[in-house]
């Protein structure tokens, strides 16, 4: 979950950056992508090693998990994280955490699911 939040924050920063700052952030995005690729490949290697001899396809499992990004359990986890980190995340609006974390998490998870789908589509 922490990796997903860091990835989402990085992507949002690049999206809203001024044009002259996008070059700098572009380097950060490249590093995030490289890190993601390394994590993904290591996870695949570990998964394949553990499931050797079983009829389980890593990519199918990943696709099924992507569909779960924007689900009830992840919404609950996001809201809990938002409320716990309200001062950092919401700043002056921290007292409104119980009211705004739900909609914010709904949007963040929808965006994260779209990003995951887009990355997954690029790999096909």
From Swiss-Prot:
Location relative to the cell: Secreted
Record keywords, A-Z: Disulfide bond, Neurotoxin, Secreted, Signal, Toxin
GO molecular function: toxin activity
Signal peptide: 1-17
Main location group: secreted
Keyword Signal: yes
The record's account of how the chain is modified after translation: Contains 2 disulfide bond.
Residue ranges the record assigns to the propeptide: 18-74
Annotated GO CC locations: extracellular region
Tissue expression profile of the protein: Expressed by the venom duct.
Domain notes: The cysteine framework is XIV (C-C-C-C).
Name of the protein in question: Conotoxin Cl14.12
